[in-house]
Amino acid sequence: MTDTTAATPFLAAAAMAADLEDWGPLAEATGEPMQTTGSTLWADGDQEVGVWECTPGPSYWTLETNEAVYILSGRMTVTPDGGPPQDIGPGDTAVFPRGWQGSWQIHETIRKLYVLF
């Protein structure tokens, strides 16, 4: 088995230090406009690793890909359709399968490391 523990601090440190570009308003926002910034760290076809940051507010999602996230800073409540809410914050990970539907209520500007696959 490969030891990957050394990669986690590297990825988190790189993600926190990444210069983010303006990615415009969040299309999934369901209230006031929410601003997003981000940086793609690696991409190959439909697979992508990057950093995403978004200002507070409510949004609704229908995911077209699988997504794994590691929260670097900020807080949000994730509520799948028909399921209970889950609060996530710094150091938490979450996996959203393709087709996942639900809401994200971002309470504090969130920065996440994401993997699309």
Language-model-derived ranges and their functions:
Residues C54, L63-V78:
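Short, conserved beta-strand element in jelly-roll/cupin
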Residues R98-F117:
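Ligand-binding loop in jelly-roll beta-barrel domains
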Residues M1-D46:
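A short, N-terminal "cap"/entry segment at the start of jelly-roll beta-barrel domains
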Residues W61, V78, K112-Y114:
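Short hydrophobic/aromatic-rich beta-strand segments that constitute the beta-sheet cores
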Residues V49-V51, A68, T93:
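Conserved hydrophobic/aromatic beta-strand scaffold that supports enzyme active sites
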Residues G82-R98:
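Short acidic-glycine-tyrosine-enriched beta hairpin
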Residues A43-L63, P97-R98:
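Conserved short histidine dyad/triad with adjacent acidic residue
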